[in-house]
Amino acid sequence: MSGNRDSILPPLEWLSAQHPPAPAAVSDWLMEPGSMTRRFERHCGRVHVEPQRECFVTRDQLGEEAEHLPDSPRYWLREVVLLGDNQPWLLGRTVIPLETLTGPDLALVDLGTLPLGRYLFSSDELTRDYIHIGRQDALWARRSRLRLAGKPLLLTELFLPASPLYATGSSVPE
């Protein structure tokens, strides 16, 4: 389990190879290689972001997330609710080491209501190291370590009950 008591995200259980795989339709969403924002836009008229928390934090405030990022004096933390047609679809938490916030990527601290995916996937220098699949009761989650010009950031996404991920008929939360 992972969780930060100050986070908008509840504790998440990250699944290992021993866990049963996600249903194929759900896995298709969770393993999405492109922008989740763009994928959501295909299922609604309007996607928008409501920032919940944006601030610098220290490594000891990250909990187990620190294992996925290099040591840094500070990390930029951004927590948001992403909505499709005014329905909350996703909770997002981004942790960015100070060293990633250089040059044009310093703009990451000023995204405000701009979806992170719009910024990240406009870069020719974006790569993804991995996607981990997780659960929180009946809800699905994913965690990705991404790199901008080789510099890391960690993105955790929890798909809320109204998310189109569950509209496939597979693993619809109650």
Swiss-Prot record:
Where is it located? Answer: Cytoplasm
Main location group = cytoplasm
Question: Binding of substrate: at which residues?
Answer: 36, 78, 116, 157
Which key words are in the record?
Answer: Cytoplasm, Lyase, Pyruvate, Ubiquinone biosynthesis
What Gene3D superfamilies has UniProt attached to this entry?
Answer: Chorismate lyase-like (3.40.1410.10)
- What EC number(s) does this enzyme carry? 4.1.3.40
Q: What is this protein called?
A: Chorismate pyruvate-lyase
- Please tell me the species this chain comes from: Serratia proteamaculans (strain 568)
The record lists the lineage as: Bacteria, Pseudomonadati, Pseudomonadota, Gammaproteobacteria, Enterobacterales
